[in-house]
């Protein structure tokens, strides 16, 4: 089963690749090439991008910064990532629009739901930056919110691991991977895949979540085609 309208959630760390921080142009190029193949198959794709490769609000808050201020700085970091991703996509011929939750009219459109959906219908990729425009909400929650707003069939969370595990597979060799699990299991077992607000929002709107490895070439296309390459939360 190929999904027709997809919300792809990219973490800031995914854009960092092997670098300690910032954006790895080779990773952006690889993601752009994968996305171009998806769009060629007439799949409507929207992207929410995080900012953890540049600044993380929770970390800033823990270091003594006011939490709301730290979150606003994090939102600006996501906009940097969004326009960098737009550049990469347009270099491989993918028509792309950036919409931000905080108005920055010189570099991006403001987020307007109907306009975003019109772009998707015309075959353009829409990259959402600036989080949801409010502090105290993660970009995972933004992904769930935007997916519900644009009537996406699935949220695809592209990460550094190939699915959801019962514990950190980088620390525990015996970690067990789930091929599928329920929203309730994620919430009750406090499995660290997305924050509880994002999971609850997807649960309430019956939007499945696919978690997969972004660094394996071609995985975005495989995930969109419905191949069982990661973990499905439903």
Curated annotation (Swiss-Prot):
The keyword Lyase does not apply. One of its GO terms (cellular component) is cytoplasm. UMP binds at residues 51, 71, 132-139. GO terms for biological process: 'de novo' CTP biosynthetic process; UDP biosynthetic process. Keywords: ATP-binding, Cytoplasm, Kinase, Nucleotide-binding, Pyrimidine biosynthesis, Transferase. InterPro entries: AceGlu_kinase-like_sf (IPR036393), Asp/Glu/Uridylate_kinase (IPR001048), Uridylate_kinase (IPR011817), Uridylate_kinase_bac (IPR015963). The keyword Transferase applies. Its main location: cytoplasm. Its EC number is 2.7.4.22. Pathway: Pyrimidine metabolism; CTP biosynthesis via de novo pathway; UDP from UMP (UMPK route): step 1/1. It is found in: Cytoplasm. GO terms for molecular function: ATP binding; UMP kinase activity. It is an enzyme of class 2 (transferase). Inhibited by UTP. ATP binds at residues 9-12, 52, 56, 159, 165, 168. It catalyses: UMP + ATP = UDP + ADP. Belongs to the UMP kinase family. Catalyzes the reversible phosphorylation of UMP to UDP. Homohexamer. This is Uridylate kinase. It comes from Prochlorococcus marinus (strain AS9601). The lineage of its organism: Bacteria, Bacillati, Cyanobacteriota, Cyanophyceae, Synechococcales. The gene is pyrH.
